[in-house]
């Protein structure tokens, strides 16, 4: 999985307000302000990285191939978080769960099996996924 470190990127784009997902609202047809995406989605720039997704193990969480994950390495993973982990030397993205006193990496796709985290497993929680950037499409 390619890791893209975050530099001192600053990109400000026009922010046009809200958009109705139900009935259209012509009252919002004006420019409100400028929105800096890096300030909106990145809370800790020095510990935030982008990773490109491969595979379908997290499609139930809305994470698809070629999506970009925004990952904050300064956050401590909590049960329920989607995390990037290093498992046996390989990057993987899964949901971090606790069930019955045990911790698992749980895929969000029934075609994949949850991974029980135990002392003999080479595992490191690498960071917490804070945002997912993807195109609006269906698989």
Question: What positions do the PLM features span?
Answer:
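Short, hydrophobic/aromatic-rich segments at coil-to-beta transitions
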Residues: 48, 78-83
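Hydrophobic beta-strand signal
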Residues: 70-71, 84
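Short, positionally conserved secondary-structure boundary motifs
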Residues: 1-59, 90-91, 98, 102, ...
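Short coil-to-beta-strand transition motifs
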Residues: 65, 87-92, 123-124
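Structural motif
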Residues: 66-67, 81
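Aromatic- and Lys/Arg-enriched surface recognition patch
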Residues: 92-120
